[in-house]
């Protein structure tokens, strides 16, 4: 079976590696154009492109696939390339570009998507973040047949994964990426044998996992400690949850919710020492923050952080 693969970040690169290791022929990879990254803002290839080049897989990086969009000539060139590349199916994982119907219609066996949620629970761009943020106890991977709607297509395979109490988006991402790689291989093997069956998605229980905005990073300490602890895990590694102390943004990377009386105003630092970490009053309960970072600094354990940043008796806004 010949596969065109479309994906961009590390999540997708893990799936591409799994397909390559399983022996599937991959005549073409689509990925987003190189982007400026790092302190020097040098152009950097996506994780998918890096894997493809290392394994001598041809790569295309169209800026758009929409024939009716801002770049119709680029889109037409991409359509022509897809039609000229012999393949059976397209596999899509966190590609980042909209696939119009004109693209979905090209692969003889359609387009399969690896989605990091138990659909229809979280449709959209940030299902891992949102699952942690709201306190879901489990998530998983859905392999689905793509259609024009956003993550609305028929479900082909689904497998759940528990969300651990200390999972961050980073750790859960890695677990789901591995699971997604295993499942897309399984799905394609079943497709080859004609054993893959589709189940329509129910609309009941569908939620939209909106892309994480940088503005969400600043915590409202009037919320409960439980809510805030989940946000800190959900926003690790991006965008990094933060509080503002005397005008300075301080990122919180690790924290636990504590039960305590509400005798302090929200944001008040109750204690800041090597033994307790940094304990901050919230609207309900308190946060024990154990890893912090100031602008331009490194992520540090609380015991190290407070040596260079006085927090005792301070208040976060």
Curated annotation (Swiss-Prot):
Provenance organism: Herminiimonas arsenicoxydans
Gene: fmt
Annotated protein name in UniProt: Methionyl-tRNA formyltransferase
NCBIfam families to which the protein is assigned, alphabetical: fmt (TIGR00460)
Name of one Pfam family that matches: Formyl_trans_C
Upper classification of the organism: Bacteria, Pseudomonadati, Pseudomonadota, Betaproteobacteria, Burkholderiales
ATP-binding listed as a keyword: no
GO MF term list: methionyl-tRNA formyltransferase activity
Record's catalysed reaction(s): L-methionyl-tRNA(fMet) + (6R)-10-formyltetrahydrofolate = N-formyl-L-methionyl-tRNA(fMet) + (6S)-5,6,7,8-tetrahydrofolate + H(+)
Entry keyword set: Protein biosynthesis, Transferase
GO cellular component, one term: cytosol
InterPro entries, alphabetized: Fmt, Formyl_trans_C, Formyl_transf_N, Formyl_transf_N_sf, Formyl_transferase-like_C_sf, Met-tRNA-FMT_C, Met-tRNA-FMT_N
Family note: Belongs to the Fmt family.
Entry function: Attaches a formyl group to the free amino group of methionyl-tRNA(fMet). The formyl group appears to play a dual role in the initiator identity of N-formylmethionyl-tRNA by promoting its recognition by IF2 and preventing the misappropriation of this tRNA by the elongation apparatus.
